[in-house]
Amino acid sequence: MQNITQSWFVQGMIKATTDAWLKGWDERNGGNLTLRLDDADIAPYKDNVHAQPRYIPLSQPMPLLANTPFIVTGSGKFFRNVQLDPAANLGVVKVDSDGAGYHILWGLTNEAVPTSELPAHFLSHCERIKATNGKDRVIMHCHATNLIALTYVLENDTAVFTRQLWEGSTECLVVFPDGVGILPWMVPGTDEIGQATAQEMQKHSLVLWPFHGVFGSGSTLDETFGLIDTAEKSAQVLVKVYSMGGMKQTISREELIALGKRFGVTPLASALAL
C-alpha cells in the first residue's frame, strides 16, 4: 500500500508551509494554502481514504469545481506543525457532483475542518481556472510582513501599489505584469471577502488585503510561493528606501516599457501610465 504522506502533493504542501513559516509569513495559525488536484493524483492512495469520509456543505454552490479534489490546510492549524504531523494539519477533500459541498477523504484528523478561508480559496480557484484556461492550480494566503507594512503608508490603489513594487525590484514587472489587486479592509473568513478577492483574481494573480496579508495564485506551489516572495522582496526594499528618506532615482516608465518588451509581457496599463 502506498502512503499518501509520501505523495508529491503532500510533500509539496509540507515544503511550502514550512518555507512560509521560516519566512515569517505565517505566525500561529495565520495563512492558508490550497492545491487543486486531479483524480489521477489521488487514485494510487485509495487505501488511505477515511472509511466514512465526513461531508461538509459549502456556503454557496460552486458547480465549476464539481468532482474536483484538493489538498488544503486546516482551520486553526499552525504552518510550523505541518511537517510534524501532515495528517492532522492537512486534508484531501473532494467536491461533490453538483458543487454543493465536499467530502474529507484523508487527513484533518480529530474532527478538524479546512481553513476558514476556504470560500475565498474556492471562489478564487474558479476565477483563475477561467482566467488561465485551467493552468493555475494553487491559491496561497499569507501575512507577508513588508507587503502588509506598505498598506499603511502607500495609497491603497492598484496602479499606485503596482508601480511602486515594479520600481522596487527589476524582476517584479516580469513576474507579475498583471499588477496587484487591492481590496478595502474587510472581515476575513466571510463570503463577502471571498467574492471581492475572486473578482480581483479575474485580473490579477496577486491580491492584497490591507493591514492583513496577500493572496497569490499560480500553476504550481513553487510558482505561487515565488510570486509572493518576489513581491515581498520588493516591499522589503521599499520599506528600507522609505526609511532612508525616499527614492532619489528609480526605474523610469521608458525602462519599464523596455523591460516588458524584452521579456514578452504586457504591463498593467494603469500602473505604467503613472
UniProtKB/Swiss-Prot annotation:
Entry-linked SMART domains: Aldolase_II
Cellular component annotations (GO), alphabetically ordered: cytosol
Cofactor binding description: Binds 1 zinc ion per subunit.
Main location: cytoplasm
Enzyme class: lyase
S-S bridge residues: none
Protein name: Rhamnulose-1-phosphate aldolase
Gene: rhaD
